[in-house]
């Protein structure tokens, strides 16, 4: 983590006014397609900016060639791009004024020294513009309290979200998806669920501190594999 996270910076992640989906599509075999579909499926009520230069329409919305072409800077961007494209895309989003981002892409510090070096460059690029990041190598987040789903897990393909005053922060994306799925089957919901991935910028403790102050969260659960 570069600097401690403030409540406003995490609010841009968990309750953004607008979201740009980089690589949005209607193809459900692709991460960008699943992220985009589930965001719309759960009736997120902020502005949605699908980013895809090759399409005229995606699920009824106008896509934009790049984040630089959106009507306003998005609070949040989410991407699942090939690793070698992430740094340039983060640079473009940060320069546009995006406040926060989720990087689903893996093979950064989780794949050795070369990936670690690139991960540090990505974080530095974002930090130079005050942009905060979840990931890389994460499943994203689920925020029923805000009707926000930016998660690549098939567990979120449900008819409706169940909101309850339980926050869950996980260092394992797979476990977050499994817990969400099993809880949903028992009628149990959440306020926010976050997969923190490599914690290159924001860490588990940042979100725990946010949830302590969150009015819609009364119980905090976490899955911890290690503490830095």
Region spans (language model):
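Catalytic-core regions of core metabolic enzymes
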Residues: 1-228
């Amino acid at each position: 983590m570069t600097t401690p996270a403030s409540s406003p910076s995490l609010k841009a992640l968990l309750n953004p006014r607008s979201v740009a989906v980089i690589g949005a599509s209607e193809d459900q075999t692709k991460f960008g397609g699943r992220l985009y579909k589930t965001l719309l499926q759960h009736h997120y009520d902020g502005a949605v900016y699908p980013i895809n230069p090759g399409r005229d329409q995606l699920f009824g919305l106008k896509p934009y060639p790049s984040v630089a072409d959106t009507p306003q800077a998005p609070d949040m961007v989410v991407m699942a791009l090939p690793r070698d494209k992430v740094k340039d895309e983060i640079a473009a989003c940060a320069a546009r004024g995006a406040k926060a981002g989720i990087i689903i892409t893996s093979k950064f510090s989780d794949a050795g020294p070369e990936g670690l070096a690139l991960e540090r460059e990505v974080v530095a690029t974002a930090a130079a513009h005050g942009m905060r990041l979840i990931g890389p190598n994460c499943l994203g987040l689920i925020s029923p309290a805000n009707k926000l789903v930016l998660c690549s897990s098939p567990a979120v393909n449900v008819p409706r979200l169940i909101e309850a005053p339980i926050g869950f922060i996980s260092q394992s994306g797979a476990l977050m998806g499994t817990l969400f799925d099993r809880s949903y089957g028992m009628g149990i919901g959440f306020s926010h669920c976050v997969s923190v991935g490599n914690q290159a910028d924001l860490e588990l403790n940042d979100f725990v501190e946010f949830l302590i102050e969150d009015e819609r969260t009364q119980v905090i659960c976490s899955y911890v594999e290690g503490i830095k």
